[in-house]
Amino acid sequence: MSNITIYHNPTCGTSRNTLEMIRNSGNEPTVIYYLETPPTHDELVKLIADMGITVRALLRKNVEPYEELGLAEGTFSDEQLIGFMLEHPILINRPIVVTPLGTRLCRPSEVVLDILPEPQQGAFTKEDGEKITDESGKRLK
């Protein structure tokens, strides 16, 4: 069993790039398709605390429920926002990666490199052609 977990959306390029960087470090993570299997309330609260971000910082803003629910207004408590995220998992920004070195919202995807226990094992180029590591696994940016 892997000691790395990714909350993943396979339709998201950032999430796909993050997953491939984890694999490029020689690790096969536990993949949680969070739209199908959202975290529990307690899991989501822990993820937010472990990332050291606000609840609002985890909210996706460019999705339908954000507008429909009026979430741009600052009138909702953290607990209410968490409830909306659990009811509409598409509101949870992604990918979230948990490793022994920390928990991060990996936007941009190369943020994952800061918390991987093993280095990249070779060159990595994102889907859009941006080079992230060279042939020796050294970070380029």
UniProtKB/Swiss-Prot annotation:
* GO molecular function terms noted in the UniProt entry: arsenate reductase (glutaredoxin) activity
Stretches for region Disordered: 122-141
The cross-references to InterPro entries, in alphabetical order and at most eight, read:
Arsenate_reductase, Arsenate_reductase-like, Thioredoxin-like_sf
Q: Which residues form the active site?
A: C12 (nucleophile)
Comp. bias (Basic and acidic residues): 125-141
Q: What class of enzyme is it?
A: oxidoreductase
Which keywords fit this entry according to its UniProt record? Arsenical resistance, Oxidoreductase, Plasmid, Transposable element
Tell me any Pfam family this protein matches. ArsC
Q: What is its EC number?
A: 1.20.4.1
Reaction equation(s) it catalyzes: [glutaredoxin]-dithiol + arsenate + glutathione + H(+) = glutathionyl-S-S-[glutaredoxin] + arsenite + H2O
Name a biological process GO annotation.
response to arsenic-containing substance
- The question of whether Transcription is a record keyword is answered with no
State if rRNA-binding is listed as a keyword: no
Cite the position(s) of the site with description Important for activity.
Answer: H8, R60, R94, R107
* Family, per entry: Belongs to the ArsC family.
Function summary: Involved in resistance to arsenate. Catalyzes the reduction of arsenate [As(V)] to arsenite [As(III)].
Q: What is this protein called?
A: Arsenate reductase
Source species? Yersinia enterocolitica
